[in-house]
Structure formats: C-alpha cells, structure tokens
Amino acid sequence: MAKPTTVKIKLVSTADTGFFYVTKKNPRTQTEKLSFRKYDPVVRKHVDFKEAKIK
C-alpha cells in the first residue's frame, strides 16, 4: 500500500484549556504550521488554535 498523502494533526487551544480539534493536512502543499481562530467551548469564546502533533 502507498503512504497516505494527508496526515492527522491536532489544533490545540491557546487558552490552555486542553481542548483540541483534530483535522488533516497535506504536508507537501502546506509546509507552515496551521493556526485558526475557532470556538473553545470550555471558555465559551473564539480563541486561536495552533497546530500540534498527535502522539
């Protein structure tokens, strides 16, 4: 079987709540780290989410 082109990554909240989203990205086309402004239900606000590895 071939190696998959997309890898799973974790988007971790910068509010230090421990909340995260899991998404996929293609490392060949998106070489920089992802950063999104998404909703964190723990603090009930939109905060920045940064990319981290899934362990």
UniProtKB/Swiss-Prot annotation:
Query: One Gene Ontology cellular component annotation?
Result: cytosolic large ribosomal subunit
The GO annotation for biological process reads: translation
- Keyword Ribosomal protein listed? The answer is yes
- Keyword terms: Ribonucleoprotein, Ribosomal protein
Q: Which GO terms describe its molecular function?
A: structural constituent of ribosome
Cystines in this chain: none
Alphabetized InterPro entries for the sequence: Ribosomal_bL33, Ribosomal_bL33_CS, Ribosomal_bL33_sf, Ribosomal_zn-bd
What the entry lists under Pfam families is as follows: Ribosomal_L33 (PF00471)
Q: Gene3D superfamilies annotated for this entry?
A: Ribosomal protein L33 (2.20.28.120)
Q: Which NCBIfam families match?
A: PRK00595.1, rpmG_bact
Which family does the record assign?
A: Belongs to the bacterial ribosomal protein bL33 family.
**What is the protein name for this chain?**
Large ribosomal subunit protein bL33
Annotated organism of origin: Rhizorhabdus wittichii (strain DSM 6014 / CCUG 31198 / JCM 15750 / NBRC 105917 / EY 4224 / RW1)
